[in-house]
């Protein structure tokens, strides 16, 4: 009797212990009735929209770059609730519990009018117009410089990401080639790179999320504001799939783009066009005999900016986060990543450079004026935070230790080392030259894990208040849950009396 057997291979053995399940914060975090409001001041930024202005003598930045296409990454620092002087032991038992902040709601305020800001390049690689050509382009001769002064408006983008860890971005960059290395002038291999989004980095403006420092060596393929920059795009696929959900509690995103013009690049096309199957050979005496370029590209445009589709200047209430972390601000901090180029107006400032004042007899000369560009931004953030308790039982501590051991270190919880075995040496004059060098004392302060990154750090440790009715966002929070004591018009009371009818007595 013939039997069919499966192809022999490696035997799969399941793990001896069940895989640990990631707990949601709602399973072990206990909310309290203490709710606080905090917020920032009106935060203003002024700078040049395209690049940093550097002093040639001292090599210091005199005017920083400030563009509406930059990421604003705010790192909000909260006070440690475990250091509060709370007398009521029914609310918090420091021997068995620890306090954390939970995000209930926030509002990201943006000031200023809506506006479109343009960017461009005085030497932009644009050989010809391929949208509505009137004649076939001439042959590119060696040594020609066909770069033009071109400007455009960027892709329209509104974005905010809220989490207790910084957001992750992605961009395309040059990869290390395999052996043998490609010839000089060949297209390099590229790879997708993930990195933390920092404050001041550029977002995608319509030319892709790429490292234009390495991918465009001619320095003329993109506008000035991203020529020497890395344009990043938030890696939402990775952050929303994170098992702990610390980087994204929730996010809002709106993009809008269309193609305004169609151009072709100047230069030699590196990838040869196949001879057969794509076109028929032209006549030898026609301009088409010298095949034109085919490295086509569009110029982006964000089109109309309207207040009807704004993501900012409105409250957001967090009821259920996307991941396992339902708004718990581990480390007493919150990261808010923002992009908004709908308020992207660049102020044009003209300054008369001559010593004499301008009077009625002056005749205009353009060389008498210097032109400057400045971009301004205005932000304000309001938060509603609830105080919550975390029980210090073994299951919760084991889960937190696997998730982030820094949480236990911040709570001053650690394993007790065993007592020393035997007697140890202790020198009296250990700092003198007669003895050996003292051992290095370890640093007791925990090192900041984000010290190598650039964030807009905002200290809110002294800006908390439990008087929610005194703040705009606090009033809306109380009104949402029916806790706001509003004045009601008293109802008028009317007393109705029934009149009794008197019956006449019938007489005989």
From Swiss-Prot:
Query: Which molecular-function annotations from GO does this UniProt entry contain?
Result: structural molecule activity
Name the species this protein comes from.
Human papillomavirus type 60
Query: Cellular component terms, GO, for this chain's entry?
Result: host cell nucleus; T=7 icosahedral viral capsid
Matching SUPFAM superfamilies, A to Z?
Group I dsDNA viruses
Q: What is the lineage of its organism?
A: Viruses, Monodnaviria, Shotokuvirae, Cossaviricota, Papovaviricetes
Q: Which family does it belong to?
A: Belongs to the papillomaviridae L1 protein family.
Q: What is this protein called?
A: Major capsid protein L1
Q: What does the subunit section of this Swiss-Prot or TrEMBL entry state?
A: Self-assembles into homopentamers. The capsid has an icosahedral symmetry and consists of 72 capsomers, with each capsomer being a pentamer of L1. Interacts with the minor capsid protein L2; this interaction is necessary for viral genome encapsidation. Interacts with protein E2; this interaction enhances E2-dependent replication and transcription activation.
* Keyword line: Capsid protein, Disulfide bond, Host nucleus, Host-virus interaction, Late protein, T=7 icosahedral capsid protein, Viral attachment to host cell, Viral penetration into host cytoplasm, Virion, Virus endocytosis by host, Virus entry into host cell
The biological process GO terms on file are: endocytosis involved in viral entry into host cell; virion attachment to host cell
Question: Any idea what job this protein has?
Answer: Forms an icosahedral capsid with a T=7 symmetry and a 50 nm diameter. The capsid is composed of 72 pentamers linked to each other by disulfide bonds and associated with L2 proteins. Binds to heparan sulfate proteoglycans on cell surface of basal layer keratinocytes to provide initial virion attachment. This binding mediates a conformational change in the virus capsid that facilitates efficient infection. The virion enters the host cell via endocytosis. During virus trafficking, L1 protein dissociates from the viral DNA and the genomic DNA is released to the host nucleus.
Where is the protein found, in the record's own terms? Virion; Host nucleus
Disulfide bond is among the record's keywords: yes
């Amino acid at each position: 009797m013939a039997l069919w057997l499966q192809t022999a291979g490696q035997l799969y053995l399941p793990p001896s212990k069940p895989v640990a399940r990631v707990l949601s914060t709602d399973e072990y975090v206990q909310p309290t009735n203490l709710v606080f409001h905090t917020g920032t001041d009106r935060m203003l930024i002024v700078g040049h929209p395209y690049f940093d202005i550097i002093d040639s003598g001292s090599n210091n930045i005199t005017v920083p770059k400030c563009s509406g296409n930059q990421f604003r990454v705010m790192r909000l620092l909260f006070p440690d609730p475990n250091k509060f002087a709370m007398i009521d032991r029914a609310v918090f038992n420091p021997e068995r519990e620890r306090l954390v902040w939970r995000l209930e709601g926030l509002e990201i305020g943006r000031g200023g009018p809506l506006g479109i800001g343009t960017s461009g390049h005085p030497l932009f690689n644009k050989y010809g117009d391929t949208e509505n050509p009137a004649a076939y382009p001439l042959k590119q001769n060696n040594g020609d410089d066909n770069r033009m002064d071109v400007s455009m408006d960027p892709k329209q983008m509104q974005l905010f990401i809220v989490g207790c860890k910084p957001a992750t971005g992605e961009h395309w960059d040059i990869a290390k080639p395999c052996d043998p290395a490609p010839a000089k002038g060949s297209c390099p291999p590229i790879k997708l790179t993930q990195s933390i989004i920092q404050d001041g980095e550029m977002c995608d403006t319509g030319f892709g999320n790429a490292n234009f420092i390495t991918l465009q060596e001619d320095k003329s393929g993109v506008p000035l504001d991203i020529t020497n920059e890395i344009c990043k795009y938030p890696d939402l696929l990775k952050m929303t799939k994170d098992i702990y959900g610390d980087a994204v509690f929730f996010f809002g995103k709106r993009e809008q783009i269309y193609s305004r013009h169609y151009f072709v690049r100047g230069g030699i096309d590196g990838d040869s066009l196949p001879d057969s199957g794509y076109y028929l050979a032209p006549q030898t005496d026609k301009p088409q005999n010298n095949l034109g370029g085919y490295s086509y590209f569009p110029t982006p445009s964000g089109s109309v900016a309207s207040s009807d589709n704004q993501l900012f200047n409105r409250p957001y209430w967090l009821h259920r986060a996307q991941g396992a972390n339902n708004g718990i601000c581990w480390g007493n901090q919150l990261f808010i990543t923002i992009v908004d180029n709908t308020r992207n107006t660049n102020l044009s400032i003209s300054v008369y450079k001559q010593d004499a004042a301008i009077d009625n007899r002056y005749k205009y000369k353009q060389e008498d004026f210097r032109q400057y560009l400045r971009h301004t931004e205005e932000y304000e953030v309001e938060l509603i935070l609830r105080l919550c308790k975390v029980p210090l039982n073994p299951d919760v501590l084991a889960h937190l230790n696997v998730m982030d051991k820094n949480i236990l270190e911040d709570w001053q919880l650690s394993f007790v080392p065993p007592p020393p075995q035997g007697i140890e040496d202790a020198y009296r004059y250990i700092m003198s030259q007669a003895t050996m060098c003292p051992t290095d004392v370890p640093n007791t302060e925990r090192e900041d894990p984000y010290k190598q990154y650039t964030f807009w750090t905002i200290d809110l440790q002294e800006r908390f208040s439990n008087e929610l009715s005194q703040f705009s966002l606090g009033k809306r929070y109380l009104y949402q849950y029916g806790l706001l004591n509003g004045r009601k018009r008293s109802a008028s009371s009317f007393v109705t009396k029934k009149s009794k009818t008197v019956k006449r007595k019938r007489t005989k």
